[in-house]
């Protein structure tokens, strides 16, 4: 690797860390908006966003959050063109971001909240590529109706598959799990 390539990689790593710090601070500020990262960093990619997500996950764990699993978004391919995405995406779900539907969930602390209905699955084993339907079903421990309260740190819900990782701080509420 050349000196220029090493310097470029170090600069990119520093930028990703800066973005993660800014996102983490915005999510914890109780309503602070930031300009979309991809408008300030034109080379910011979905892969970079997942690096930011990993750093924010580490920050959450340091705060005492316990990861419970992941939320998979954009599983409906008909929405991809409208939102400029080309594959499903995911975000972490934590013990402090999961709520029972029987308990009221105030919306005041959220930044521009949006509510999305969900079907939630609890997995006992991770699915593997190439599984048939029966094998995939054996990975599922429970199913529940639920909803996701999504918030965005970007003003007016600016969206692009490149810069939005709003799932980092969404809340999920689930009904009773059924085997």
Question: Where are the language model's segments positioned?
Answer:
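Catalytic-core "active-site belt" of small-molecule-metabolizing enzymes
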Residues: 2-179
